[in-house]
Amino acid sequence: MPGGIDTHTHFEMPFMGTKSIDDFYTGTKAALAGGTTMVIDFVIPAKGESLIEAYNKWRTKADGRVCCDYSLHMAVTHWNEDVRHEMSKICSDTFGINSFKMFMAYKDIFMLT
């Protein structure tokens, strides 16, 4: 039987003064124990943080610590021309992001207005 793919994980995700308890090591180790062999985690930039800075931060958290294959989605938490320009860069082969999430909830935290 092939392994599963979890397309919606939040390892070490900061949120409202806390962060999710699983890091990339414990989360992917648990995933493997349950038969999941790949995860896709959300990169969530802080307000004002560039997409590329956030991507690099997530890669630093994950690389060398994951126990299975992984990829990344990108959340867009604020909007300006720099973000629009970075979206095309982040889709390049260098970064490999090919999906974005924009929030319609969490006003004053993630919601795009």
Predicted segments — roles?
Residues 44-56, 61-113:
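Histidine/acidic-residue-rich, glycine-tolerant segments that coordinate divalent metal ions
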